[in-house]
A protein has these predicted regions:
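Signal-transmission/dimerization alpha-helices at domain junctions
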Residues: 155-176, 217
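A cross-family signal for key residues in well-ordered alpha-helices
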Residues: 157, 209, 222, 240, ...
Length: 265
């Protein structure tokens, strides 16, 4: 691993980032600083309120392509299938977290991964997370077209303490001097809580949500403290009530509940 603090450009980039604490360009500067040491394809800074809707603070694409429609779909309710969002809501500790740490056992076989994550977040993801007490959590996501290897994780672990400290200090400065709304907040309904509520029982709703997030029957049984056979019975019943027979159809219904046509991505 190279010495992170030997090159003049490193010192200059870090200084520029510190200068932007509490300012609009903070996130972009922090992302550019991280790119000096590690290649990644996209980055996303988010705030996830404990109660309320998430807000995108910075969207970065290394190729300059971007996809506003994909971001709009995520913010309209798809974020509720994001394992990092769930981890933030469950108050995972501050620091660097890998996808494998937070994702359900069959996440890479889920429709969310196959139809959204793999196309827009790409192959792998890590996040720096800062808990904001009762108000929510702050995250900085880095996405990559190939897996982050052990050397990459090691490098990110080295810089993690001061990255997290900068994020926390930036948010503190904003809370002391609130910035005007950016217009990026989306007023949307809680699609996950409404999805299927008219026809499914509370237990069936719970299982439908876990299916969408990528949990296997075994993992669902462990999480809910019931048998895998009971899970399978509930799955059959909820599929019958929704007149579907597969996870792809369940995912399509969820997209429709967000106002998105799955036939027109």
């Amino acid at each position: 691993m190279h010495n992170l603090f030997t090159e003049a450009s490193t010192h200059a980039g870090l200084a520029r980032t510190v200068e932007q604490i509490g300012q609009p360009r903070f996130w972009r500067q922090l992302i550019l600083l991280l790119q000096q040491w590690l290649a990644f394809d996209n980055a996303l800074a988010m705030v996830y309120p404990r109660a309320g809707l998430p807000r995108a603070l910075e969207i970065f694409d290394a190729r300059g392509e971007g996809n506003p429609e994909a971001m709009a779909l995520y913010l309209s309710g798809l974020y509720q299938l994001d394992p990092f969002y769930q981890a933030c809501q469950e108050r995972i500790g501050d620091g660097l977290h890998r996808l494998e740490e937070v994702a359900p056992d069959q996440f890479r076989q889920s429709e969310y991964y196959l139809k959204y994550f793999h196309d827009h977040v790409l192959e792998d993801e890590v996040q720096f997370i800062v808990q904001l007490g009762e108000s929510g959590a702050l995250s900085l996501s880095l996405g990559r077209r190939e897996r982050f290897d052990s050397a990459s994780h090691g490098l990110l672990a080295v810089v993690c303490p001061w990255v997290v400290a900068l994020m926390a200090q930036h948010w503190l400065q904003l809370s002391l001097c609130p910035a005007p709304a950016t217009g990026m907040a989306h007023q949307v309904r809680d699609a996950m809580s409404l999805f299927g509520a008219k026809v499914l029982s509370e237990r069936e709703l719970e299982i439908a949500r876990l299916i969408l997030r990528g949990y296997s029957s075994k993992a669902m049984a462990e999480r809910l403290a019931i048998s895998p056979e009971t899970i399978k019975v509930h799955r059959r019943h909820l599929y019958a009530k929704l007149d579907i027979s597969s996870q792809p159809e369940l995912f399509s219904l969820f997209l429709q509940s967000l106002g998105h046509d799955p036939q027109d991505p």
